[in-house]
A protein has these predicted regions:
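Short glycine/proline-centered loop/turn elements that form peptide/ligand docking sites
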Residues: 131, 157-161, 175-185
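Conserved acetyl-CoA-binding loop-helix of GNAT-fold acetyltransferases
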Residues: 123-137, 167
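Short amphipathic alpha-helix that is part of the acyltransferase structural core
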Residues: 2-42, 46, 51-53
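Conserved acyl-donor/pantetheine-binding loop and adjacent beta-alpha core of acyl/acetyltransferases
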Residues: 65-114
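Conserved active-site alpha-helix within GNAT-family acetyltransferase domains
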Residues: 144-146, 151-175
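Short hydrophobic/aromatic beta-strand element in the GNAT-like acyltransferase core
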Residues: 49-53, 63, 109, 114, ...
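Conserved beta-hairpin
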Residues: 48-67, 73
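Conserved glycine-rich acetyl-CoA-binding loop
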Residues: 105, 118-129, 157
Length: 190
């Protein structure tokens, strides 16, 4: 796992086609682990998302899945964007496109539908590196327009992923649902 120097290990990202590679995958969150072991493959089979595995050498150390999404921003959230009161600052919108951008009622996005790091590989900056890889994937994809990356960050008593995503420049896209298990976050791509 560690080569004795400060060079982070190479992360190899590929489409996940062999779900048996996940047979011993555990991220340490029981609900997510159960989902990965029993229902993740069904989500993929029913075209909900495209799965990716992340390897260091020959070991799956993380997985994520992506699907298309849209960001609907209420006016007060647009005001926050205009003022730069988000984790990612003011969007890089040209002056000629500004009126068009702010008049939209929804914006194209790619959602991180699932994201998990193998328990023994957590706290090694792999998650942050993967978020940046996902941002680059979203920027490079050429199937449709994409201005944001979104995620429903898992949050329950005793565990919340919101802090991790905020460190990765995500901001709240909606107020938290007091009875829900997730909080919707977004990050501007440009």
């Amino acid at each position: 796992m560690s080569s004795g120097n400060d060079t982070p290990p190479r992360l190899a990202i590929s489409l996940l086609t062999d779900f048996s590679l996940l047979s011993d995958f555990q991220c340490g969150i029981p609900e997510m682990d159960r989902f990965i072991q029993s229902r993740f493959e069904d989500s993929v089979a029913h075209h909900f998302c495209i799965p990716y595995s992340v390897h260091i050498d020959d070991k799956v150390v993380a997985l994520f899945a992506l699907n298309f999404d849209a960001v609907i921003l209420p006016e007060d959230y647009k005001d926050d964007l205009k003022l730069g009161a988000t984790a990612f600052g003011v969007p890089g919108i040209s002056e000629s496109y500004e009126d068009t951008f702010w008049s939209k009622w929804h914006y194209p996005a790619i959602e991180i539908s699932y994201f998990a790091i193998r328990k023994e590989y957590q706290q090694r900056q792999i998650g942050r590196r993967l978020i940046e890889e996902i941002v680059q994937l979203a920027r490079r994809q050429n199937i449709g327009g994409c201005q944001f990356v979104t995620v429903e960050a898992y949050r329950k008593p005793g565990y919340s992923a919101e802090g991790f995503y905020r460190k990765c420049l995500f901001s709240r896209c909606a107020d938290p649902d007091p009875v829900g298990d997730t909080i919707r976050l977004y990050r501007f791509l440009y």
